[in-house]
Amino acid sequence: MQTSGNYQPVPIGFTVPSAPPSYEEATFHHPPYPPLHQGMDAKNMSNPPYIVQPVPMQPPVTVQTVYVQQAMTLYDRPVQMCCRSCNSMITTRLEYSSGALAWLSCGGLCLLGCIGGCCLIPFCIDSLKDVDHYCPNCHALLGSYKRI
């Protein structure tokens, strides 16, 4: 018979591999545990000590609540607001002081010829003065209103 292709005859002494091992042969059997020694009693054996390590404690976090008060525009009239100093609800107390508008009005009157004391009239008119707002309870300055 003639062989075609790259087939070669089986060499002499070659054995065909056998089937895989059976399930019993393939599973590994663990050896049994050794029996307890006669001198040892399982009831009296103590477990190794259980060491508990303390959990590291974090310092408590303190939260500070900050109330942001919107900038209040102050005018020449009393304003009802919460005092930043004593935290009470108040109506501001007004104090008038001579500001730039009073001095410019005085200078303008001097230029017009009102030298004989009439140029001091702007210092008597509250609507030409700057206004300071104070807390009536703690007397803290809460803000100012500048005319110029």
From Swiss-Prot:
Keywords of the record: Cell membrane, Cytoplasm, DNA-binding, Endosome, Golgi apparatus, Lysosome, Membrane, Metal-binding, Nucleus, Transcription, Transcription regulation, Zinc
Membrane topology type: Peripheral membrane protein
Chief localisation class: cytoplasm
Subcellular location: Cytoplasm; Nucleus; Lysosome membrane; Early endosome membrane
One Gene Ontology MF term: zinc ion binding
Domain LITAF, residue spans: 63-147
Superkingdom, taxonomy of origin: Eukaryota
Sequence motif: PPxY motif, positions: 20-23
Keyword Heme: no
Region: Membrane-binding amphipathic helix, residue numbers: 101-123
Family: Belongs to the CDIP1/LITAF family.
Protein task: Plays a role in endosomal protein trafficking and in targeting proteins for lysosomal degradation. May also contribute to the regulation of gene expression in the nucleus. Binds DNA (in vitro) and may play a synergistic role in the nucleus in regulating the expression of numerous cytokines.
Notes on the domains: The LITAF domain is stabilized by a bound zinc ion. The LITAF domain contains an amphipathic helix that mediates interaction with lipid membranes.
Protein name: Lipopolysaccharide-induced tumor necrosis factor-alpha factor homolog
Protein's gene: litaf
